[in-house]
Amino acid sequence: MTRAPRCPAVRSLLRSRYREVWPLATFVRRLGPEGRRLVQPGDPKIYRTLVAQCLVCMHWGSQPPPADLSFHQVSSLKELVARVVQRLCERNERNVLAFGFELLNEARGGPPMAFTSSVRSYLPNTVIETLRVSGAWMLLLSRVGDDLLVYLLAHCALYLLVPPSCAYQVCGSPLYQICATTDIWPSVSASYRPTRPVGRNFTNLRFLQQIKSSSRQEAPKPLALPSRGTKRHLSLTSTSVPSAKKARCYPVPRVEEGPHRQVLPTPSGKSWVPSPARSPEVPTAEKDLSSKGKVSDLSLSGSVCCKHKPSSTSLLSPPRQNAFQLRPFIETRHFLYSRGDGQERLNPSFLLSNLQPNLTGARRLVEIIFLGSRPRTSGPLCRTHRLSRRYWQMRPLFQQLLVNHAECQYVRLLRSHCRFRTANQQVTDALNTSPPHLMDLLRLHSSPWQVYGFLRACLCKVVSASLWGTRHNERRFFKNLKKFISLGKYGKLSLQELMWKMKVEDCHWLRSSPGKDRVPAAEHRLRERILATFLFWLMDTYVVQLLRSFFYITESTFQKNRLFFYRKSVWSKLQSIGVRQHLERVRLRELSQEEVRHHQDTWLAMPICRLRFIPKPNGLRPIVNMSYSMGTRALGRRKQAQHFTQRLKTLFSMLNYERTKHPHLMGSSVLGMNDIYRTWRAFVLRVRALDQTPRMYFVKADVTGAYDAIPQGKLVEVVANMIRHSESTYCIRQYAVVRRDSQGQVHKSFRRQVTTLSDLQPYMGQFLKHLQDSDASALRNSVVIEQSISMNESSSSLFDFFLHFLRHSVVKIGDRCYTQCQGIPQGSSLSTLLCSLCFGDMENKLFAEVQRDGLLLRFVDDFLLVTPHLDQAKTFLSTLVHGVPEYGCMINLQKTVVNFPVEPGTLGGAAPYQLPAHCLFPWCGLLLDTQTLEVFCDYSGYAQTSIKTSLTFQSVFKAGKTMRNKLLSVLRLKCHGLFLDLQVNSLQTVCINIYKIFLLQAYRFHACVIQLPFDQRVRKNLTFFLGIISSQASCCYAILKVKNPGMTLKASGSFPPEAAHWLCYQAFLLKLAAHSVIYKCLLGPLRTAQKLLCRKLPEATMTILKAAADPALSTDFQTILD
């Protein structure tokens, strides 16, 4: 029998999503009579391959095979497949086998599919076509019979393995829609076996005590809100405060997919109804509540939570039934980019302003916060439900909150706490809207401390002391408030952190009846949830609405993800200057109301792009965001938007296909670090193969306003020559890819491939084999699900859509709409590709000779020329300085850099910035040695920036594991072959690059440590943090070996693994010693380990390492803020 492909990662992924996974032969043998063999001597190879590669997966809760199973064939394969497809369509089941088929109706007529009465095909399905005509499947039908094959196709999921490491789905619910059982109700096993973390290496830390298992700190625990009486000793990555009592283990339910849920048996004989999906919730020590807590009356509002009714058929509720379904994070993105007219006032939609300060308004507020009611601004009054006693008693407190809000003078508090930090005359000049005062206006942003003072003052005025309960609770909330507004663009504050150390029993308004000193555990947990709901609303609604009412909050181009708070009065003036400058620079034509209405009513309506600005050091940068204005007939507009997006993705895929097939169309364009590495490596090896290395002349140039200056006529000409030269017909295949990473997280992506009919791989097996042969990593350890395939997309229709996209793009600036008359519409995936194609055509016509014996690179609009001919370098520079109006190409001399002298008269009186002949030449984040052609990384972009705000780090759930994985993932990105290739760089250069990578990792390590929640300290888990540091060296050394195959690097080589560990420890010692109060316990073990490594390393290697770690080479890091 043909040996089955191993594909262990694919099999593991399927086992995590299905109840049972069997090879086809094993599955049939279990059902058939003894002695029946699916594969017999003399069977054709294609059939034996099918049986070996086919996996049968059983869903949770799927029905068993028929009791009277027959192994006789009655129907032909085409008839059987048609019967299964008709049954799936009639039941409206989501099945891969039925993709592209639908039932006939009056609106969609046409001939039915063969052997069916009411099913038509509207898109080809290659899986069906394979089944209908395959001789292997016909032989399989003759061996297993109609009944079993129908059962396999209709009730199971079949997968075919494609060597070496992927598979595709034949039938069953799409894998990307199936959740793992652990995603429904996570269970904690009574005992779990600790495993050694990946990449952890303690061979150089032998002085440490024997580590039993540091992964025990990573083990999952029941989610619990901190409460009084609970010890505060948390493991580093614990998701909660460990309970004093032993966690109760619940059985894991069997999850059934589909619209109808059934009561499924559990191993204990009990039953319950599975929940369709898991929703985030308030973490509690125990999730079920007694009827005394009146859980059925509770539901948090809006996006915070949803309401679940208990099942009447279940005697034992699962641990997450009837629990509060809270969104566990408050995100900073909710208060970014607020719109308004520039007036500093509460928004008309501000919740508290729409409620009367009386008991009726208080009741409405209680319902909105705690009972899930939505704010009602107009319309008839709905029937009100009777409040329980607990919530009825809350009304006076929330009435007082409404009264305090009505009396609070927000504008006066704003002016008091967020004053401008300059002299009055400077402020008066700055508030002028003329462009010369733009820089003064940019400095008038409020600091996070000023914003915190304003918010604190508002909360002190509005929220009474009775709602806080104690000053301790108030201080805890203000501490979290300060942290919240100091987060970066992608920052999140978790509900667990918000409730950390809150004293629930001091909030008497949570009680349903007064005077009880001792309360049941269920009642205490209910009070915890109510308090969590209130604090979540206070931060996520009240504070966020205050910020959106009085500030415009945005990131900048020079401070990574750090947020800047501009008062609305300041930002309105900044925006008016930015709009004026943008209209002067870009050719736009204003549209009338009738034109806008006509544009929106068109079926292929372009999305209306909104223009916003972000600060940069010397002005404002316009950013175009593509969004859809729904307005009336929202459903129709949404369909228009989806249709337009699909066409845009098809056009993008088609241009990428032509670009790959004809690489010369892109000229010298590079699309990323991999392209730069491939091109630069080939150039360096070619130069070093010469008898004598010539002197190289470097030119760096940046095109001014590339996207806005390209003439649309020239762009149409370039694209027309690209896609209309052969009037091709394209085939578009859309498919999904599901894979699981090394941490066990399942990722899904949706892709499309465009080819011509001549290049089409019609069947999935051929298609996946072709993709794996062309790129071994493209589908590694993945499962592919084909969604659709279209074979009639003409190049002329795509070109017409391109013209529509180019000439009908609409930008909304303020309340006015404009259409772009010149340049490339921004905000879409096409913008960069179109710009590269246009400049590539220019290079092919003007700079073909310049690249002789040299190298021309361009990353979008940043040129780099390296040539041994001085006259060619001067010609190239002169051409760009004088401009190429035909392509809208004009460079910015202030950003132009050369390493040779240029006479001022030759360039019209101006001269570019000149560097020495031998220097480190900067280009696109790289430093290129002009003499040796070695490559360093440019870290000057980190100057005066905060690593803490630039690093997106989710620090709540399994914080330690998340921290380790985050650092390792960033390290893998930074350890690029361009810096580690010993054929491009010398050993000394590679050591310098590795040391700087480790030094930046040390800064990231510190940024993660100071963000760890729940008062975590390094001294509480010393072994774990030492393991993280050691794993950085092990991971980097493993990447170094992969980037230098065939080279001797080990103990007898030029760079042993101890060298990587020494550089790593040296970098971390340099950074952590600056924060000795935090890392005092780490410094001693690191120094001891480094001394042990010095004894193992040869003297020559130590000399290279010490030279690489010279502080004079890493002065760029001294200006980093963290």
Curated annotation (Swiss-Prot):
Region CTE, as annotated, extends over: 929-1122
The identity of this protein, by name, is Telomerase reverse transcriptase
Record comment regarding domains: The primer grip sequence in the RT domain is required for telomerase activity and for stable association with short telomeric primers. The RNA-interacting domain 1 (RD1)/N-terminal extension (NTE) is required for interaction with the pseudoknot-template domain of each of TERC dimers. It contains anchor sites that bind primer nucleotides upstream of the RNA-DNA hybrid and is thus an essential determinant of repeat addition processivity.
Its gene name is: Tert
According to the entry, every stretch annotated as the Reverse transcriptase domain falls at 595-928
Q: Where does Mg(2+) bind?
A: 702, 861-862
Return the annotated region ranges for QFP motif. 381-511
User: Which residue stretches belong to region Primer grip sequence?
Assistant: 923-927
GO annotations of cellular component type: chromosome, telomeric region; cytoplasm; cytosol; mitochondrial nucleoid; mitochondrion; nuclear speck; nucleolus; plasma membrane
Basic and acidic residues compositional bias: what residue ranges? 284-295
Catalyzed chemical reaction(s): DNA(n) + a 2'-deoxyribonucleoside 5'-triphosphate = DNA(n+1) + diphosphate
Q: Which family does it belong to?
A: Belongs to the reverse transcriptase family. Telomerase subfamily.
Q: Is Lyase given among the entry's keywords?
A: no
- Motif TFLY, per the record, lies over 332-337
Q: Which organism is it from?
A: Mus musculus
* GO terms for MF: DNA binding; metal ion binding; protein homodimerization activity; protein-folding chaperone binding; RNA binding; RNA-directed RNA polymerase activity; telomerase activity; telomerase RNA binding
Query: Region (Required for regulating specificity for telomeric DNA and for processivity for primer elongation) spans which residues?
Result: 137-141
**What InterPro entries has UniProt attached to this entry?**
DNA/RNA_pol_sf, RT_dom, Telomerase_RBD, Telomerase_RT, TERT_C
Where do the record's region annotations for RNA-interacting domain 2 lie? 329-540
Q: Where is this region: GQ motif?
A: 58-205
